[in-house]
Amino acid sequence: MTADPDFSDLTEREMAALIYRITDELSTRGTRAAFAELLQVVAYVGERVGVAARTLAASNSWSQVAEVSGTSKQAAWERWRS
C-alpha cells in the first residue's frame, strides 16, 4: 500500500468486514510470517478494544460498555478502565 486509505466514509460494519476478510486471508496462508503478523494483530486489537471501551465510557457511560460487551458495569470497568 502506497498511501493511507480514507476509511471515514465506511460504516462500522463495512470496516469490520474488511478486517474479517484480511484476518481470514492471514489465517489461511499457512506461513510463519502470516502467523506472526496475525499474533501481532491480535495484540493490537486487544489494546484498541480497551481504548474503544474507555472512549465509549467517557462519551456515554460504563453501563453502555457493559451492555455492548455483555458483562456487568463493574466487570467492564475493571477490565478496561486503564
Predicted regions and their residues:
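Short, Lys/Arg-enriched anionic-surface-contact patches
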Residues: 28-51
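Key DNA-contact positions within bacterial/archaeal DNA-binding proteins
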Residues: 74
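The alpha-helix within a helix-turn-helix
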Residues: 65-66
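General nucleic-acid-binding
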Residues: 1-27
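Short alpha-helical segment immediately N-terminal to, or the first helix within
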Residues: 54-56
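Key DNA-contacting residues within the recognition helix of helix-turn-helix
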Residues: 77-78
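Residue-level signal for the short linker/turn that defines the boundary of a DNA-recognition helix
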Residues: 59-61
